[in-house]
UniProtKB/Swiss-Prot annotation:
Catalyzes the oxidation of 5,10-methylenetetrahydrofolate to 5,10-methenyltetrahydrofolate and then the hydrolysis of 5,10-methenyltetrahydrofolate to 10-formyltetrahydrofolate. Coiled coil: none annotated. Keywords: Amino-acid biosynthesis, Histidine biosynthesis, Hydrolase, Methionine biosynthesis, Multifunctional enzyme, NADP, One-carbon metabolism, Oxidoreductase, Purine biosynthesis. Belongs to the tetrahydrofolate dehydrogenase/cyclohydrolase family. Gene3D superfamilies: Leucine Dehydrogenase, chain A, domain 1 (3.40.50.10860), NAD(P)-binding Rossmann-like Domain (3.40.50.720). It comes from the Bacteria. This is Bifunctional protein FolD. Homodimer. It catalyses: (6R)-5,10-methylene-5,6,7,8-tetrahydrofolate + NADP(+) = (6R)-5,10-methenyltetrahydrofolate + NADPH; (6R)-5,10-methenyltetrahydrofolate + H2O = (6R)-10-formyltetrahydrofolate + H(+). PANTHER family: C-1-TETRAHYDROFOLATE SYNTHASE, CYTOPLASMIC, C-1-TETRAHYDROFOLATE SYNTHASE, CYTOPLASMIC-RELATED. Pathway: One-carbon metabolism; tetrahydrofolate interconversion. The keyword Magnesium does not apply. One of its GO terms (cellular component) is cytosol.
Length: 271
């Protein structure tokens, strides 16, 4: 069975639009990129369309060199007309920590800044990483998380690690196991899970044999195989478990939350 996230998306969007109606000015999101590849360009175009659907002002700044990236981030961080900054990754020739040193955590709508990740550890985050937050929103919409055995496949700072932290919070109290592609006996571990979150970036990694019946599988993966977008979960897993689709699942909610973060920043800035 596939999990339909459209009602959740509509609910989030309606709440955002209601909050936007109370603002004095239109919130603004600026995306900063450098030497973007075709997939990055495609993503930014889809992000621009999403911003327009939500009624946000949107700009793309393509830097001509790495120094210009840092200069632009500093300027945008100080610009009171800008509420959110999105930085495409990876940025050639630039250390990620150097990027964050020039980016205000209050405008880091992706929740990737070390300050925001640190606050997440204390359960006092302003921005959580959008994809991890999207997974939590979906899970809370379809099941009770407390006491469930959750296996996360993936250990990135954008999904795996922050998601584990969010699920361990006292108000959620899941039992969390974090695995990765080098984990021994991975099928043995996943078969005991009530919930599996596949975020390893490996196409069709999770198979039917790795999943127990009636479990919930959240597919975060986006991979291209023979020109087709596929997830980290093999398609037939939906025959025995509840699975989020790819595309149109986690990514849809992630986009909505990215826009919500821009509005949240605008509210804090008394826009």
């Amino acid at each position: 069975m596939l999990i339909d996230v459209k009602p959740l998306y509509s609910e989030i969007k309606n709440l955002i639009m209601d909050r936007m109606s109370k603002l004095k000015k239109v919130p603004k999101l600026v995306a900063v990129t450098y030497k973007p590849d075709p997939s990055t360009i495609s993503y930014l175009k889809s992000q621009e369309k999403a911003a327009k659907r939500f009624g946000l002002d949107y700009e793309i700044f393509e830097a001509s060199n790495s120094i210009e990236v840092l200069e632009k981030l500093r300027k945008l961080s100080e610009d009171k007309s800008v509420n959110g900054i999105f930085v495409t990754h990876p940025l050639p020739e630039l250390d990620e920590m150097l990027v964050f040193e020039n980016l205000s955590p209050e405008k880091d709508i992706e929740g990737r800044h070390p300050y925001n990740l640190g606050m997440l550890m204390y359960g006092n985050e302003f921005f959580a990483p959008c994809t991890a937050e999207a997974v939590v929103k979906i899970l809370e919409n379809v099941t009770e998380i407390t006491g469930k055995n959750v296996v996360i496949i993936g250990r990135s700072t954008t999904v795996g690690k922050p998601l584990a932290t969010m699920l361990l919070r006292r108000d959620r109290s899941a039992t969390v196991t974090v695995c990765h592609t080098k984990t021994r006996n991975l099928p043995e571990i996943t078969r005991n899970a009530d919930i599996i979150v596949a975020a390893a970036g490996k196409a069709r990694l999770v198979t039917k044999e790795m999943v127990k019946s009636d479990s919930i599988v959240i597919d975060v993966g986006i991979n291209v195989v023979d020109g087709k977008i596929v997830g980290d979960v093999k398609e037939d897993v939906s025959e025995i478990a509840k699975v989020t689709p790819v595309p149109g699942g986690v990514g849809r909610i992630t986009t909505a939350l990215l826009m919500e973060h821009v509005v949240k920043s605008a509210e804090k800035m008394n826009f």
